Each structure stands twice: as structure tokens, then as C-alpha cells.
Amino acid sequence: MSLLVKRWKELAEIKAELAARDWFFATSGNLSIKVTDDPLTFLVTASGKDKRKQTDEDFLLVDASGNPVENTHLKPSAETLLHVEIYKKTNAGCSLHVHTIDNNVISELYGDEGEVAFSGQEIIKAFGIWEEDAVIRIPIIPNYAHIPTLAKEFAKHVNGDAGAVLIRNHGITVWGRDAFEAKKFLEAWEFLFSWHVKWLLLKQTAVLPVVKP
């Protein structure tokens, strides 16, 4: 099995798992996985595809500029430049971007603060943080319509081989050293978002102690 085929199957499996969670509303979201380092190439989801379905045109191979390596009628996902920034600046092997209701709500609630922090949740250990009173933060950036501008702002927060950024009223982009790590981190962040949204709703309908995220 060639490396390209292996990576394709890895990304297809992740796409199927995330689709089963209904995280690809209205063809939104984009996924990528690195294939080679030198030259840099990676598979990225094709634009406008229904990600609940599996086809032979789900992904295309692009270069370090986000352009298709071969002639194709397919177009890379709109936010491919964000994936480019990740692979250029880090040793990450996979990047996942999804639009969920919970991550959009959280990004709007805390968008003016530029970040949101969570503590006191066991799931934080998924990030390799084992301290009892650990706090984890995720930056929130504006949702610039001009993708090069968005990518430039996004790049300011790409500082390690694993990380995450929330784009306000848009979605979350998570990256990791490999596909397993990226998916694990995405699941952990979405758990935290969902927990906090539900906690806020409960506070509106019952007498509960005030707990900050």
C-alpha cells in the first residue's frame, strides 16, 4: 500500500467518524493529513462535498501553497490556507476543522475576551495535562471573510505540533502530530464546549452554583 493510499484511508476513516457525530452541517468543515515533508504535500477535503458520503473525490493532494498537485476539476476546501500554515510552521501530521453549534456558541460568548479557559474537567487529561487544578485555554480569533487575512491571524496562534484555535461564529481548527491525536483533541474540545453550554442553560433554569469555565 502506497503512503498516499494509507493516508487517504486514515483521513476517510476520520471523516466517517465525524460525520456520524453530525459535525459536517451543510457541507461545512474541512480535514487534512500530511503525506510528505519534502516537498510538503497533504490531502485536503474537496470543496462543496457532502462529507456524510464516501466517494473517490473526497480529497485531493495539494502542495505547500495549497494548490492541487495534479490537474483536477476539484477545488481544495476554502480554508486550505489554514492547513498550510499548520504544516509549514509545525511537525503536525493532521488538521481537522468542524463547525458545530456548541463551538459557535462558545466562540460568540467569549469572542470579545479573545479566549476561553476551562478547568476542573477530567477530559483535560486528554491533552496530556495531568495537574489536579489544570487550566486549558483556546484562543478565539475574528472570522475574516478574506481567507489570506484569516490565515495570517490564525498563524499567530500556531506555535506547536499540537494545538487548537476557535474562529468566532465559524468553527474550531485542531491539529496534532498524527490523525489519532488530532481527533482525540477535537473530541476533547467539543466535550468541553458541550459541557459548558449545557451548564449555562442549567443555570438559567435552576439554582446552581456559579462556575466559570
UniProtKB/Swiss-Prot annotation:
Name of the molecule in the record: Methylthioribulose-1-phosphate dehydratase
EC number: 4.2.1.109
Catalytic activity: 5-(methylsulfanyl)-D-ribulose 1-phosphate = 5-methylsulfanyl-2,3-dioxopentyl phosphate + H2O
One Pfam family linked to the record: Aldolase_II
Residues the record lists as binding Zn(2+): 97, 99
Subunit architecture: Homotetramer.
UniProt xrefs under InterPro entries: Aldolase_II/adducin_N, Aldolase_II/adducin_N_sf, MethylthioRu-1-P_deHdtase_MtnB
Pathway terms, separated by semicolons: Amino-acid biosynthesis; L-methionine biosynthesis via salvage pathway; L-methionine from S-methyl-5-thio-alpha-D-ribose 1-phosphate: step 2/6
Function: Catalyzes the dehydration of methylthioribulose-1-phosphate (MTRu-1-P) into 2,3-diketo-5-methylthiopentyl-1-phosphate (DK-MTP-1-P).
Gene3D superfamilies associated with the record: Class II aldolase/adducin N-terminal domain
Keyword DNA-binding: no
Keyword annotations from UniProtKB, A to Z: Amino-acid biosynthesis, Lyase, Metal-binding, Methionine biosynthesis, Zinc
GO cellular component term of the entry, any: cytoplasm
Gene Ontology molecular function: any one: methylthioribulose 1-phosphate dehydratase activity
Cofactor comment text: Binds 1 zinc ion per subunit.
Keyword check for Iron: no
Names of required cofactors: Zn(2+)
Protein origin, superkingdom: Bacteria
Name of the top EC class for this enzyme: lyase
GO BP terms in the entry: L-methionine salvage from methylthioadenosine
NCBIfam families per record: PRK06754.1, salvage_mtnB
